[in-house]
């Protein structure tokens, strides 16, 4: 009976038990969390989330993870689902209080800030907001999420796009992060604008396994102790050029798998203890300042597959132990000072895919055993003094797809006739220093290479006749520059896929064939520096043409200007003999960005229709023509215009007021015209203006705003208003607000040129050129360094004292205030200009002594104080002793032993005209004297390598021809 009762009770309880069991296994999500998710869906219009419907259990929805016991939503993965819109502080997302894992990566939150309300999600362990177009300052509240083990706030560089909005942090963020997030294992803040030092406390996050601080604008000394965190497996400090540091002595218990230090200011030796990183698979120590030898112990890193030591200051030979790295696939050591022969052990690296040896001092030939690298695809050995038959061993590696052998000292191209043995070759670069030592190259050797897409040959004589019909038709890029070609290569017309053609720096004469402009895929042509004289008579711009870049500069073209395509973005016809007016058809080039028609014989006025180009134009160079009339009012919408040069023409009238619309303008040059106007103070609204040249016009009035407004122009680095009719007294605080010339430059940053880097079909960029008076002579700079600073007020009617505030311009390198009516004393504040290289205050009425403090200016290579009323001794400084006597003449009151050392027995002199022969000798002496002073005398070259860059760009014959004897005489007599 009892058994029966128990059985009945059991049967009665079964349904209740089953109901309880089913309830426990269904894990129905809570209604409030379902509602929050649906509200979030509506906030962003998630059209692709078909599973997100009210009738189903949200735990089964795509991207949702629920807790098995409670049914709470603990995971939300909405990465890469094209969310678009503002992530707002009242978002229903923040109602999901049980979240542990949240991934919103790769969406577009439309530059909205990260809401502080994330701190409500106190259970978060993983948060990924990467690549989601968030901007603004990261809220400090985020650091209250103390359970975080993974935090990803990274974004991308977008190639330096200034319009891109980055995330940023305040100074307290990193120290607080190090204190609060002690459980953190993964931190990625790449391209967050940190803009600070990394605190030492980071080394206390002992759980840290992965740290990515790429592109964070870090500076200061990086704590090396962070590299010694025992659990750290990956660290990336790349693209922080102002971040200093050294590699520590590594310990055996290090867990590093990947170490990336790229484009930083890290320095010092690579320690022998690098061999302690037994598990390392990727080592990148590139574009920094590491020095010394590659340690032999590096060969102990048996798991290493990627090794990059490029662009440092490493010396010595590649150690033979490198052959022990049998897992290595990529090997980069280019851009160092490595020397000697390549080790034969390189042949042991049978998994190698890439070798880069470029820009070193390697000698000898390639080891024959390198032909055993059967998986090698990319071989770069440019710019080394290799000799001998370097090609021969490479021709035995059929896997090769890319070979760069430019800038080597090959005795000959031995073996190139066997290049057909590389059937997979896609890219071939070869350049020779001295093509007179190389036999002519027959282009037919490339005819069997059906995969060849890029062929770059330079400074090797070639013959373009008798080219076979099966010449590689898949070529997309063909460069035959400096190859001694005399006739236009006919075989090119067979290139049905050709996109880029470079025939520059040859001796091609005659006319450009009409078929060139009809090639359907061609988008870039460079025919510069040849002897071409015209175009086929029937040629017209083809409406089907895809040409975006054409360079016809430095030829013998004459007659009307020819425009081969309506899709041009870059066009240069400079240094020819084009005549006539600028054709109105140019106004139809709606995509034109760079137009250079300088140094021709174009005449007439600028067509008003150029206004249609102003929305796209970035560089307009019309200098040295015969253009006339006024500059038209066409610039109001020229917001992209970076450089405008109409110098050395016959322009007249006033400067157009619409220039204030050129908000991106960096260079304005209207020198050597007939413009009659007052100083354009209204242009101080152009916050990017770096170069302003108004010389040799009819400008008049004062150089300071009588309304008391500051001079402005915060970025101005070069101003030349010489040889005009400016008058008046410069106020004592005149130079007070010249920010770019007074702010200290970072000496660790490599000097750059003022340029537009985006020249289509060219890697060289489009550089700003300029003619300036420096050290007594006119000079043409084909490229202008951004650190170059100059003021030229000479040849006006300025008077009064030279303002003491001139001493604030600590970055000033050239100062010319000659041929005015300045009075008073030479301001002693000039001694503050430690970078000053050229000082000309001649032809004034300045009195008193030369301040002895100027003798401390070790950079001052050229001085002219002649024809004033100076008295006393010249300073004792070496620079003053090295000047010519003419630098002091016309000052009867100057005396003393220092002057006698320079001039011997002193005779009073007056500025008179001299014989033509004497003038010619003097101008040449003067020209070369400042070059000698700037380069040959070490204390005068604080400018260092940067000044060298400028000097190599000077065209002595050109500016002597253009600004020769009469210019020199005028300078002396004023």
Swiss-Prot record:
LRR repeat ranges, renumbered to this chain: 96-120, 122-145, 147-166, 181-204, 206-229, 230-252, 254-277, 278-301, 302-325, 327-349, 350-373, 374-396, 397-422, 425-448, 454-472, 473-495, 496-519, 521-542, 544-570, 572-589, 590-616, 618-638, 639-662, 664-685, 687-712, 713-737, 785-809, 810-833, 834-857, 859-882
Domain of life, source organism: Eukaryota
A Gene Ontology cellular-component term: plasma membrane
Location of the protein in the cell: Cell membrane
Extracellular side: 25-930
Pfam family for this entry, one: LRRNT_2
Cytoplasmic side: 952-974
Glycosylation sites: 54, 90, 253, 279, 300, 348, 434, 466, 484, 529, 577, 603, 624, 637, 737, 816, 845, 864
Membrane-topology descriptor: Single-pass type I membrane protein
PROSITE patterns: LRR
UniProt similarity note: Belongs to the RLP family.
Record's protein name: Receptor-like protein 7
Gene symbol of the encoding locus: RLP7
